[in-house]
Amino acid sequence: MESFPVINMEKMNGEERAATMGLINDACENWGFFELVNHGIPPELMDTVERVTKAHYKKCMEQRFKELVASKALEGIQAEVTDMDWESTYFLRHLPQSNISEVPDLDEEYRRVMKDFAERLEKLAEYLLDLLCENLGLEKGYLKKAFYGTKGPNFGTKVANYPPCPKADLIKGLRAHTDAGGIILLFQDDKVSGLQLLKDDQWIDVPPMKHSIVINLGDQLEVITNGKYKSVLHRVVAQTDGTRMSIASFYNPGNDAVIYPAPALVEKEVEEKEVYPKFVFDDYMKLYAALKFQAKEPRFEAMKAVEANVNLGPIATV
């Protein structure tokens, strides 16, 4: 079996750059996922993020999860639970406006550390988007502009903990789905596994690695690349031992960004048969909210129905 793609970003600055770009392109085309090492975010900062996140969960969320979810979700069940997830989560918004100061129960160290971490992830996301542009033959900055809208991109972090589950065979930590947005940067637990992606009809583990950042592509990049890159189904399998930490940061288009295949990636002779629609990102998100755990193709088809109403202005400039 092929091994999960791991990209050493230190090699981007030397004679192995072309080969490394090839690995990134192959991962985007054939996996929809890859894992970055030596990505430039200090290991000491990542250790601090992990420490304060796990401390916050134990102090503020663990008991709440036991009372509100764990005590009720598995009571008397015999068949698989398909309408909920075994996870404890909250969301931090960074762009266009941060909400970190408003989220209750966060101490000042946590707010400061997560703000620093988010700023570094934002830069890494934009750097990766430019690498994707290079591999796709698009002008530098194209994807960032495509995401921009009038107020810039949406960027936020879902902080999740997946506690041990006594009936891990009957409930998922997180049910299978593709991500709606752009590019996702995940800092995951390096000891407790659980994340899996679907490749060639088989569920494959995303290996936990210390200080790595896992990258996956969302539905919007599939549309903009006209299907050259694909978003991929993934899930979190509940574990009987250990609490898994997951800090997933989503660099997404702005709400009013108009998303459509890059003209340079649409073959002229098949323009009439475009697979992917043009739509406003916020409209897609409203649809996705109801259909997250279903196939993405009907979502794309549904957006074609409203395509006639989309006012396609020029691509935004930063």
Swiss-Prot record:
Q: What induces it?
A: By water stress.
Entry keyword set: Ethylene biosynthesis, Fruit ripening, Iron, Metal-binding, Oxidoreductase, Stress response, Vitamin C
> Which residues make up the binding site for Fe cation?
H177, D179, H234
Question: EC number(s) on record?
Answer: 1.14.17.4
Q: Name one GO biological process term.
A: ethylene biosynthetic process
Instruction: Name it.
Output: 1-aminocyclopropane-1-carboxylate oxidase
Q: Does the keyword Metal-binding apply?
A: yes
For this protein, the record's InterPro entries field holds:
DIOX_N, IPNS-like_FE2OG_OXY, IPNS-like_sf, Oxoglu/Fe-dep_dioxygenase_dom, Plant_2OG-oxidoreductases
GN (gene name): DK-ACO1
Which terms in the Gene Ontology molecular function aspect does this entry carry?
Answer: 1-aminocyclopropane-1-carboxylate oxidase activity; L-ascorbic acid binding; metal ion binding
Cofactor(s) this protein cannot do without? Fe cation
Family affiliation: Belongs to the iron/ascorbate-dependent oxidoreductase family.
What is an example of a Pfam family matching this protein?
A: 2OG-FeII_Oxy
Q: Where is the Fe2OG dioxygenase domain?
A: 153-253
- Which pathway is this protein assigned to? Alkene biosynthesis; ethylene biosynthesis via S-adenosyl-L-methionine; ethylene from S-adenosyl-L-methionine: step 2/2
Tell me what reaction this enzyme catalyses.
1-aminocyclopropane-1-carboxylate + L-ascorbate + O2 = ethene + L-dehydroascorbate + hydrogen cyanide + CO2 + 2 H2O
Q: Which PANTHER family does this chain map to?
A: OXOGLUTARATE/IRON-DEPENDENT DIOXYGENASE (PTHR47991)
